[in-house]
């Protein structure tokens, strides 16, 4: 189990959340 894959997944998730912060604010 390489931590590289986990890091990549985490990075992608964070990127998605940072790139689409409007969807979360739009709900408000």
UniProtKB/Swiss-Prot annotation:
Keyword annotations of the record: Disulfide bond, Ion channel impairing toxin, Neurotoxin, Potassium channel impairing toxin, Presynaptic neurotoxin, Secreted, Signal, Toxin
Stretch forming the signal peptide: 1-24
The keyword Aminoacyl-tRNA synthetase appears for this protein: no
Cellular component GO terms, alphabetical: extracellular region
Highest taxon listed in the record's lineage: Eukaryota
GO molecular function (one): potassium channel regulator activity
Tissue: Expressed by the venom gland.
Assembly information from the UniProt record: Heterodimer; disulfide-linked. The A chains have phospholipase A2 activity and the B chains show homology with the basic protease inhibitors.
Main location: secreted
Function of the protein: Beta-1-bungarotoxin is a presynaptic neurotoxin of the venom. The B chain is homologous to venom basic protease inhibitors but has no protease inhibitor activity and blocks voltage-gated potassium channels (Kv).
Compartments where found: Secreted
Protein name, per record: Beta-bungarotoxin B chain-like
């Amino acid at each position: 189990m390489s931590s590289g894959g986990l890091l990549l997944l985490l990075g992608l998730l964070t990127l998605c959340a940072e790139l689409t912060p409007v969807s979360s604010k739009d709900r408000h």
